[in-house]
């Protein structure tokens, strides 16, 4: 047993590396990573709900350990509420809020932070166990440890974002920091998902080089889809951050026009791309539509091509998720039902993951 553990941690023996590369070990590690990906996707939903509730500023301290325990007594609740009363959001937006109202915004943010801790536990504990038992191939060990560290960095970015909302004159977090927080979370989710695919389908099982060359065009279309979806997601973070979904709730026109008359209301002009509600909504509409057209074109081309079965399935899933995504976006806008918008944000990550899957299935073996 001791020799097995040493081989697992150091990976210096052929037997240890063979165990890590076995189908059983790969399956176990892949399942763990897919579960982690699912938990991260759920975190997007919780975060979106927190934002819709304007609850993100309700907890005034970042306490990774002691913050696990919420207020348990009336006096503790009053102390927490008193801290909230010191920030501009309470003074300008929520003055007169009672303790029950404060609890209503406290709990979503507390759950959001607890879910982050759960993610750290879910990723960190199995990682240690897999390393100790030699279930992870040597080439993946530094990368998986890096992913765990990046998860902690995401927590720091989250607090950096929240802290921006405590500044004088501000009643919500910085739109720019919100975008960084969301985009970093998306990158982390996709990195975990792609790593799971790598574990499940190692290099030696990929397409032969000559076959991969034949599908180079489809692979480029998958990469193009990744780029288009990513750009639309980034634009969506500024729509969400400015609450631009609260205006111009018609489709496809805005205020009876294709381009809203107040698109360039802010000066200098560049601010409109990030801080002008009309502009951020128009940009997301436009970029989302461009992404939809581009992705659908890729899916149609993939269906017509003689792709391997799994690659074809990936493109079909991407197409289905794209249609759902567009319907969710338009429905959120015209109905003003924010819960649909939460699903829209969740589905965006799944759509991007499907595009990554399609690209991954067309990769060739190393020469």
From Swiss-Prot:
Organism field: Acidiphilium cryptum (strain JF-5)
Entries under HAMAP family matching the protein: HemeA_synth_type2
Record has Signal as a keyword: no
Subunit structure: Interacts with CtaB.
Gene name of the record: ctaA2
Function: Catalyzes the conversion of heme O to heme A by two successive hydroxylations of the methyl group at C8. The first hydroxylation forms heme I, the second hydroxylation results in an unstable dihydroxymethyl group, which spontaneously dehydrates, resulting in the formyl group of heme A.
Protein name per its UniProtKB record: Heme A synthase 2
Membrane-traversing stretches: 28-48, 114-134, 143-163, 180-200, 221-241, 286-306, 314-334, 340-360
Xref: Pfam families: COX15-CtaA (PF02628)
